[in-house]
Swiss-Prot record:
Domain LRRCT: 128-146
Coiled coil segments of this chain: 211-239
Ranges occupied by LRR repeats: 20-45, 46-66, 67-89, 90-110
Span of the signal peptide: none
GO CC, any one term: cytosol
Main localization of the protein described in the UniProt heading: cytoplasm
Annotated function: Involved in the regulation of the cell cycle; is required for the basal body replication and new flagellum biogenesis.
Organism of origin: Trypanosoma brucei brucei
Presence of keyword Coiled coil: yes
Primary gene name: dnaaf11
Pfam families documented for this protein: CS_DNAAF11_C, LRR_9
Cellular compartment(s): Cytoplasm, Cytoskeleton; Cytoplasm, Cytoskeleton, Flagellum basal body
Keywords: Cell cycle, Cell projection, Cilium, Coiled coil, Cytoplasm, Cytoskeleton, Developmental protein, Flagellum, Leucine-rich repeat, Repeat
Designated name of the protein: Dynein axonemal assembly factor 11
Length: 383
């Protein structure tokens, strides 16, 4: 089962530097997705969304997409139109080749005042007598239905015959409701209305129903899992399988405590290989300043900074820069800035109070010593 994750969204948002908060368009077609999730919360400025050729059975989780103009859900398992009332700017909706059978559900789209293009080609509801007239009358804002322009005379005819059409459509909706209850009873009794079918060559045949599409997906996933297991077993049984597995295993990143326990100290690390400088005498010896040359156009959402009393960790696209410190600092006083000119990252951390006190005492001792030396020179000169 494919799922919509933050990682998937960022990979599909490479044209926007992986930033999701201001993403305008994203394509998630052919990802074996069964449920819409995360998009409505992570990408609230989305205007164009492609979810075609998946296994989505319900329209949900899109109520926060106030700027969404085009939604493509063609070739999925959707049986009912719902969940789009919050998409105030929606102009185009494509539900081609789904399983919407109850044409009355199009009335849920009345709230979408700007909707002027609707595609329902290939859905069972298009075979209902009076389908087009019913939709044209139910959605007066429509300019185009199933790729054909809605003309004024067609709208007038639909209005005149609305009573007869409504009777036929409601009767069909009632039949569909009874059929749905029957299907639920089959499922409750753990029976299948779609037993496996094979042709004369013994090849598996599938029908065009939501259940059989999902069954096809499950069988494909099981076949892929079985092939991976067989491949893994072959590699494991080969002479150099164990060695190859050890070499290909990604090293686990150690925590600071684990690194000290293993090496006796913290190591300097630069996994992203970015230039950086460390100034431990900044502000007249009162603070530490770490400057990292981060690429100018890299999104700030891909940068994370962690400061502890004796080290600084900077994660750039999940790659670690670790800088041990010779003196303890005060993490609560950290100040992080990013240059809008060249993207440079500047981290300033003041030293811990006891370190500042030691620095101050050392400075006073140095000044007294310099004062005594100056007095001795003056006495030698007068003598």
């Amino acid at each position: 089962m494919g799922r919509i994750t933050t990682d998937l969204l960022r990979r599909r948002a490479e044209h926007n530097e992986g930033c999701l908060s201001n993403l305008k368009e994203v394509a998630l077609h052919q990802q074996d997705i069964e449920r819409i999730e995360l998009i409505g919360d992570a990408c609230r400025e989305l205007e164009i969304l492609y979810l075609c050729n998946n296994y989505i059975s319900r329209i949900e989780g899109l109520q926060h997409l106030k700027y969404l103009k085009y939604l493509n859900l063609a070739v999925n398992n959707i049986t009912y139109i719902e969940g789009l009332e919050g998409c105030e700017a929606l102009e185009r909706l494509d539900l081609t080749l789904n399983f919407v059978a109850d044409v009355t559900c199009v009335e849920r789209l009345r709230a979408n005042a700007f909707l002027d293009q609707l595609h329902l080609t290939g859905n069972p509801c298009t075979k209902v007598a009076g389908y087009r007239a019913y939709v044209v009358h139910a959605l007066p804002q429509l300019r185009e239905l199933d790729g054909e322009e809605v003309i004024k005379t067609e709208r007038l005819e639909a209005r005149q015959s609305k009573d007869d059409i409504s009777v036929a459509v409601n009767e069909e909706a009632l039949r569909l409701q009874k059929r749905s209850v029957s299907s639920q009873r089959w499922l409750h009794e753990a029976l299948t209305a779609f037993p496996p079918r094979y042709n004369e060559k013994g090849e598996r045949l599938y029908g065009h129903t939501p259940e059989e599409r999902l069954q096809m997906l499950r069988e494909k996933e099981e076949e892929e899992r079985r092939k991976r297991e067989e491949q893994r077993e072959r590699e494991r049984s080969s002479q150099f399988g164990a060695i190859r597995e050890e070499l290909e295993r990604k090293p686990q990143r150690l925590t600071a405590e684990e690194e000290i326990a293993k090496h006796g100290r913290l190591l300097l690390r630069n996994e992203p290989k970015l230039p950086f400088t460390l100034d431990e005498e900044a502000d007249d010896g009162e603070a530490v300043v770490l400057t990292v040359k981060v690429p100018r156009f890299l999104s700030t959402t891909l940068i994370d900074v962690q400061v502890e009393v004796n080290y600084i960790r900077v994660f750039v696209k999940e790659k670690l820069i670790q800088v041990p410190l010779s003196q303890e600092v005060a993490p609560s006083g950290v100040n992080v800035q990013r240059s809008s000119v060249n993207g440079e990252l500047r981290i300033r951390i003041p030293y811990a109070p006891h370190v500042l006190q030691e620095v101050s005492e050392a400075r006073r001792r140095r000044q007294r010593l310099l004062g005594l030396l100056s007095d001795d020179k003056n006495e030698d000169g007068t003598g």
